[in-house]
From Swiss-Prot:
Organism, scientific name: Dictyostelium discoideum (Social amoeba)
Family: Belongs to the hssA/B family.
GO biological processes: culmination involved in sorocarp development; slug development involved in sorocarp development; sorocarp development
Signal sequence residues: none
Induction: By exogenous cAMP.
Pfam family, one: Coiled
Name of the protein in its database record: HssA/B-like protein 27
InterPro entries, sorted: HssA/B-like_chaperone, HssA/B-related
Disulfide bonds, paired cysteine numbers: none
Length: 97
């Protein structure tokens, strides 16, 4: 599984995370109603405007993100590996996996 980022508090905060087993780190930015994944970018239909390891950022609505994954553990958003190994949402990923 990949721990994406803490989602206990949504605000104008920034955090970094990296996928387990990955030598690349990804930046996760929290806005008032969205999460932006950058640095490594993402792939698949969930993040159509981002590409792996290009630094392109793509935003996803928090409600949609939680609805698609629907699982938090101890305030951490957990995603099973799927597709590119990231978000598990139709092959989409956040960061380099």
């Amino acid at each position: 599984m990949t721990i994406l980022a803490s989602i206990c508090k949504l605000g104008n905060t920034k955090s970094t995370s990296s996928s387990i087993g990955s030598s690349y780190s990804s930046a996760v930015s929290f806005g008032s109603n969205s999460v932006s994944c950058g640095e490594c970018g993402g792939d698949g239909p969930s993040f159509p405007n981002a590409s792996p390891r290009t630094g392109v950022k793509a935003g996803v609505n928090v409600d949609g993100l939680l609805g698609a994954i629907g699982k938090t553990v101890n305030g951490m958003l957990i995603s099973p590996n799927g597709g590119g190994g990231g978000m598990g949402m139709g092959g989409g990923s956040c960061g380099c996996n």
